[in-house]
């Protein structure tokens, strides 16, 4: 995930991997949509980049969500997300509320993410809540 985060051009680079049985299935990083008021605005979070890559074919099929979850086997995967600071130290990368909602809906049961102390926290998504707003969400919703 660190190698992926290093590819990001954003102010807060995030990298993510989706693993299954100890094997990396797919990796990704956060990407910008455009420059808005001279700042990079995040359009695609790292965790959603990974999920989009893994799920793109199945999600286009006209199946109900339960069937898609079964085919994808995401319940057996772990989603890992990290953030790098300017000096390449780990920072807080707990998914925002929107990403957490999507992660749960797709049936991912475990998530690992970095915190501000350089640790990786592993949680069962059933008990993982997030009211965190990404910086891009704050920029578009300044009353946060």
Each language-model region and where it sits:
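Zinc-dependent deaminase catalytic domain
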Residues: 1-144
């Amino acid at each position: 995930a660190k190698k992926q985060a290093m590819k990001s051009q954003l102010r807060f680079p995030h990298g993510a991997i989706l693993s299954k049985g100890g094997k990396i299935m797919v990796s990704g990083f956060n990407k910008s949509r455009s420059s808005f008021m001279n700042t990079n605005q995040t359009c695609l979070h790292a965790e959603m980049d990974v999920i989009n890559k893994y799920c793109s074919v199945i999600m286009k099929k006209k199946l109900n969500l339960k069937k898609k979850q079964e085919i994808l086997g995401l319940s057996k995967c772990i989603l890992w997300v990290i953030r790098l600071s300017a000096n390449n130290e780990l920072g807080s990368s707990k998914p925002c509320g929107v990403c957490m909602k999507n992660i749960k809906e797709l049936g991912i049961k475990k998530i690992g993410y970095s915190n501000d102390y350089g640790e990786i926290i592993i949680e069962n998504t059933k008990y993982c809540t997030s009211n965190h707003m990404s910086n891009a969400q704050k920029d578009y919703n300044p009353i946060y």
